[in-house]
């Protein structure tokens, strides 16, 4: 028997950094997916094959007879840790120890870009292996197991990434609680800078500024929280689609300005954001921790133009949409 499952990437639409201080955030699944194929094998071992784990921005240097790989391949290897822990959790849940499983991974999600590649591979693995072993788990249960996988591998996790990846659509997150928002189409373009931001260092930097200058930083964080609430109101409102796009675009630009004020933007991120806006995006902002990683732009009827502008500005564009579905069982072959 063989099972193929897939799980989507995510973007933080609004509220990164301020979420650390108890403010809400909105995240959404996007149509870039990780596919995991799981099958039972005779050998009593776990075999993991990674056919296509994307590590964008490959840099190679040549010096006399030596070749230096400058890209961090540790990030690709780290993905395998999530797969291993996810399989172990499912085996534990199914109470099956001496079983042989082969897992094959292919992915459209770049690793280390802040798009939730680790959560997607964990969720898809849990989905495929649990189905293979006859475990009937709800998407909420799979999200919780995905969260547990992240905690085991990285030691800390809000649970946003695996929840979005398992359930799909829009998720409103506040103080550890999740609310599924109604689905709406968002024609977006994600732009990758080619390098990942140092999340821990950036969070620590914001914390330092918060402690040193609370009278300046607290109002910024409060404003960010209000942007998220306003964005939620727009998504829930009955205004037409075009009006929603306009309002969300304005809120994206405000949120980006506030993130810039915190000091988490970079020259490259700003170049991609402004290139997207000039090309016709209604809004563009950092998604994730900043310091590198990705931005995204809301570009109804302008996705190709915005993608071209991002490429010319030195980024890697990915034209995508919000994914209504989270985890999907693509195929079961008996």
Curated annotation (Swiss-Prot):
Residues noted as binding ATP in the record, renumbered to the chain: 110-120
Stored Gene3D superfamilies: 3.30.230.10, GHMP kinase, C-terminal domain (3.30.70.890)
Annotated signal peptide: none
Active-site feature positions: 161 (proton acceptor)
UniProt family annotation: Belongs to the GHMP kinase family. Mevalonate kinase subfamily.
GO cellular component entries: cytosol
EC number assigned by the record: 2.7.1.36
Cofactor: Mg(2+)
Localization in the cell: Cytoplasm
Assembly and interaction partners: Homodimer.
Name of the protein in its database record: Mevalonate kinase
UniProt cross-references to InterPro entries, sorted A to Z: GHMP_kinase_C_dom, GHMP_kinase_C_sf, GHMP_kinase_N_dom, GHMP_knse_ATP-bd_CS, Mev_gal_kin, Mevalonate_kinase_arc, Ribosomal_Su5_D2-typ_SF, Ribsml_uS5_D2-typ_fold_subgr
Source organism, top-level taxon: Archaea
Keywords recorded for this protein, A-Z: ATP-binding, Cytoplasm, Isoprene biosynthesis, Kinase, Lipid biosynthesis, Lipid metabolism, Magnesium, Nucleotide-binding, Transferase
Gene Ontology BP, a term: isopentenyl diphosphate biosynthetic process, mevalonate pathway
Reaction catalyzed: (R)-mevalonate + ATP = (R)-5-phosphomevalonate + ADP + H(+)
Example of a GO MF term: ATP binding
Function: Catalyzes the phosphorylation of (R)-mevalonate (MVA) to (R)-mevalonate 5-phosphate (MVAP). Functions in the mevalonate (MVA) pathway leading to isopentenyl diphosphate (IPP), a key precursor for the biosynthesis of isoprenoid compounds such as archaeal membrane lipids.
Pfam families tied to this protein: GHMP_kinases_C (PF08544), GHMP_kinases_N (PF00288)
Listed pathway(s): Isoprenoid biosynthesis; isopentenyl diphosphate biosynthesis via mevalonate pathway; isopentenyl diphosphate from (R)-mevalonate: step 1/3
């Amino acid at each position: 028997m063989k099972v193929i499952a897939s799980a989507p990437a995510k973007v933080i639409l609004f509220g990164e950094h301020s979420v650390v201080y108890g403010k809400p955030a909105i995240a959404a699944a996007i149509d870039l997916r990780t596919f995991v194929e799981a099958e039972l094998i005779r050998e009593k071992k776990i075999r993991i094959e990674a056919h296509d784990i994307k590590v964008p921005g490959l840099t190679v240097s040549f010096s006399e007879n030596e070749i230096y790989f400058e890209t961090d391949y540790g990030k690709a290897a780290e993905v395998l840790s999530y797969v291993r822990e996810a399989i172990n959790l499912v085996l534990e849940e199914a109470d099956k120890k001496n079983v042989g499983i082969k897992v094959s991974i292919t992915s459209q999600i770049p690793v280390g870009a802040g798009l939730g590649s680790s959560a997607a591979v964990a969720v898809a693995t849990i989905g495929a292996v649990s189905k293979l072993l006859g475990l009937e788990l709800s998407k909420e249960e799979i999200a919780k197991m995905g969260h547990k996988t992240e905690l085991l591998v990285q030691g800390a996790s809000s649970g946003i990434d695996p929840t979005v990846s398992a359930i799909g659509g829009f998720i409103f997150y506040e103080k550890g609680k999740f609310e599924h928002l109604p689905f709406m189409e968002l024609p977006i373009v994600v732009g990758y800078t080619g390098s990942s931001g140092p999340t821990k260092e950036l969070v620590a930097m914001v914390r330092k500024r918060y402690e040193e200058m609370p009278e300046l930083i607290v109002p910024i964080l409060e404003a960010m929280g209000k942007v998220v609430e306003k964005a939620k109101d727009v998504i829930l409102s009955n205004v037409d689609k075009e009006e929603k796009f306009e309002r969300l675009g304005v809120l994206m630009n405000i949120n980006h300005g506030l993130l810039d004020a915190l000091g988490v933007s970079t020259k490259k991120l700003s170049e991609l954001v402004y290139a997207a806006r000039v090309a016709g995006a209604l809004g563009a902002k950092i998604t994730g921790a900043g310091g590198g990683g990705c931005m995204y732009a809301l570009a109804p009827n302008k996705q190709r133009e915005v993608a071209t502008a991002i490429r010319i500005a030195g980024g890697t564009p990915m034209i995508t949409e919000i994914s209504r579905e989270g985890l999907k069982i693509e195929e079961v072959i008996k």
